[in-house]
Amino acid sequence: DNFMYIFKRIIQKDNFISSIDIDANFNISLYINKIYNSLELENLVENIGSEEMEKKLGKLFFEDLFNLYRVKDKDDLFNAIKNNTQSTFLNLRTKVDIDEFSSGEKQIYILCLYWALLKSSEIEIPFIIDTPYARIDDTHRNNITSEYFSTISDQAIILSTNTEIDEKSYKIIKPKLSNEYLIEYDNKNKKTIQNKGYFFEV
């Protein structure tokens, strides 16, 4: 629930992700609700088989099929699918291939996992993030600025360049900041200099 809440707030795409599943070994799978007709299911059974179906479509896909066909094992399930003479449509949770995400979508996915883990732990710890917008487009940058940083923790430390948090993003996040520091390397004196304020204010 925590993951889906923040992911939807940031990604803001319809029919992109419907649910998340985390197994006992902390393997994470994302799912989307998808409509299949009985002929599609029969073709899947005949063409790719049980093992490849579960790998491609996910554990929850089979859980839904077991419940809908009221069977308990795959042999009975496949027989039921093959013997189904009626044309029916089924809404099934289908695994999403994360490898097909764009670089920005993958980064948002990881950021949201961190957010969900922190919220689920119910432990308040500082959150530190470096170059938060590396592959993120402008729309999602604004969503991360307004929805993510101010809610992930009571103390968030953001290490950013002036091109990442530009003047537009800075105006959004400014009211929520406690302190700002500009850290620069002094080549002449071979040392790091720290000043109060952000790039636009120093």
Task: Please identify what each model-predicted range represents.
Residues D130-R141:
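ABC-family nucleotide-binding domains
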Residues T139-V202:
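C-terminal lobe/lid and adjacent interdomain/linker elements of RecA-like ASCE P-loop ATPase modules
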Residues G49, K55-D64, N84, S103-P126:
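GG-anchored amphipathic helix commonly corresponding to the ABC/SMC/Rad50 NBD signature/C-loop
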